[in-house]
């Protein structure tokens, strides 16, 4: 497995053709009085071919700094950053690992790549509007993310059930 910064030489519109964005969710976290409470709320997340093509076009748009995990020239994970700082934070816009490749350290490796990118760009934290599924929040928490004390209002409004999380990556001067 190799983590690479995406460019036109290693990524095309067809690069996500076989990507499996599938997740069966049973439990989600909800905020209640400032605390995360786990509640039963089953749903399934699944990308069809149209959604995968749209994601590939987003990656190729030039609006994001994107790292992908490649296994035998196939994309098995992606993480997209909005390159402009927001109050000293870089925002993770998208972060997924293909279903069959989860629990292999790929997400951790992708996150480390964007931590290094954030440091190069002078950020002190990473910010993410996270799907509230138990698995997703447990992963982000294990990676050092905590509920943001300064959530970005547009993300809260657009995704009211997402949890706004951030991870400090260096000490402020």
Question: Which ranges hold each PLM region?
Answer:
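Structural motif
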Residues: 121, 142-143
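Helix-turn-helix
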Residues: 136
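A generic structural signal for beta-strand entry/edge sites
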Residues: 87-89, 125, 162
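Conserved acetyl-CoA-binding loop-helix of GNAT-fold acetyltransferases
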Residues: 97, 103-116, 141-142
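Acetyl-CoA-dependent GNAT
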Residues: 7-12, 18-89, 93, 98-99, ...
